[in-house]
Amino acid sequence: MAVAPFDERSTMMYLAAEEPQMPLLPVWPEVVIGLICFGIVFFVFSKKLLPVINKTLEERREAIEGGIEKAESAQIEAQSVLEQYKAQLAEARHEAARLRQEAQEQGAVIIQEMKAEGQRQREEIIAAGHTQIEADRKAAASALRQDVGKLATDLAGKLVGESLQDHARQSGTVDRFLDELEAKAEAAR
């Protein structure tokens, strides 16, 4: 093979012909340089960047755990407040029921007292009415006796033809006559 001395194309072909054709095996100088670069990058990351990342991750983990603990404590506190609220609500309902029962009992007592007072007043009014009626009846009977006595005396005087002026006498006679009429009326009943 003849190769032109300074031709680029021919130089490339010459170099390509000299290298063995093994595409799966890496070139060792590249591997060594790659490992050194990887070690430098790994060292920089592990010394500079990794602590910052780990610190940030640890802070986030602590914040999350703290948030969970706070949420749990808040939930426990909320449950406690809910239980207190339920207890207060039950107590208020019990108190309201007790007050309602007391009000009903007091209302029943007041109604009974008012009924008794009304009955007593009714009986007093009836008794006063009976007393008044009896007094009016006696007054009317007395006035009627006097009027009947006077009319009877006048009528008797006209029938007899003489005046019966003896007041005491006529009064006794008329009273006696009316008493006899009342006794007969009561016996007939």
Swiss-Prot record:
Keywords: ATP synthesis, Cell membrane, CF(0), Hydrogen ion transport, Ion transport, Membrane, Transmembrane, Transmembrane helix, Transport. The keyword Ion transport applies. One of its GO terms (cellular component) is plasma membrane. It holds the Pfam family ATP-synt_B. It is a single-pass membrane protein. It is found in: Cell membrane. The chain crosses the membrane at residues 25-45. F(1)F(0) ATP synthase produces ATP from ADP in the presence of a proton or sodium gradient. F-type ATPases consist of two structural domains, F(1) containing the extramembraneous catalytic core and F(0) containing the membrane proton channel, linked together by a central stalk and a peripheral stalk. During catalysis, ATP synthesis in the catalytic domain of F(1) is coupled via a rotary mechanism of the central stalk subunits to proton translocation. F-type ATPases have 2 components, F(1) - the catalytic core - and F(0) - the membrane proton channel. F(1) has five subunits: alpha(3), beta(3), gamma(1), delta(1), epsilon(1). F(0) has three main subunits: a(1), b(2) and c(10-14). The alpha and beta chains form an alternating ring which encloses part of the gamma chain. F(1) is attached to F(0) by a central stalk formed by the gamma and epsilon chains, while a peripheral stalk is formed by the delta and b chains. Belongs to the ATPase B chain family. This is ATP synthase subunit b. It comes from Streptomyces griseus subsp. griseus (strain JCM 4626 / CBS 651.72 / NBRC 13350 / KCC S-0626 / ISP 5235). The gene is atpF.
